Each structure stands twice: as structure tokens, then as C-alpha cells.
Amino acid sequence: MSFKKIIFIFFLIFSNSVFADDKMVLGLEVYNNKAQCGTCHTLHAAGSVGNIGPNLDQLKPQIPQIIAAVTNGIGMMPAWEGILTYEEIEAVAYYVFNSTKK
């Protein structure tokens, strides 16, 4: 394998890792501060113990499910479309999914 290929592969792996870390940080920020999801939801990774909405640690929702719920609202949960950007909705979905998949 050529040196250029090794460098290229290393760059791809490293850049994806940095992007994922940024998405987790933004997701946590949205969860805890901008949308204050922990007011209603329990999520151990975020230190939240809400008891109105589903316990996300137990539910273990998938990313598309989270995006749909946050965007459109569900049950008592309000829709966040127009309040959060799509990037923020995607980041909070990524954060919740990765925090509960263990």
C-alpha cells in the first residue's frame, strides 16, 4: 500500500472521529440547554431524570425515530421544527442514540 493511500485512510478515519465528537457535543448542548429535553426525559449520559416523557435509556430509540419525534412532536412533546435547526435536531438524535445503544 502506498504512503499516500495510508495517509488518505488515516485522514478519513480521523476526520470522521472529530466530526462525531462535534456532533455529540452539539447534541448534548441541545439536549441539556436549548431544548431542555431532560425536563421530561431520563437519560443517564446527560444526567437527566425527567418523569413526564419516556425514559430514553429504556426506550433506546433509533435516529430516524428521534428525528421524527423532535421535528413533529409526539404525544405531549411539542414539535421543535422551526425552533431547532435541522443540524441541531440531527445532533440531538445522534447524541441520544449513541448514549443509549450500550
Where are the predicted features?
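Short, non-ligating residues that shape and space the ligands of small metal-coordination modules
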Residues: 46-47
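Post-cleavage N-terminal segment of exported redox proteins
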Residues: 1-25, 69-70, 83, 95-102
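Amphipathic, positively biased hydrophobic alpha-helical segments used for protein targeting
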Residues: 11, 38, 61-64
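Sequence/structural segment immediately N-terminal to covalent heme-attachment motifs in c-type
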Residues: 22-43, 58, 72
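Extracytoplasmic electron-transfer domains, predominantly the class I c-type cytochrome c fold
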Residues: 50-102
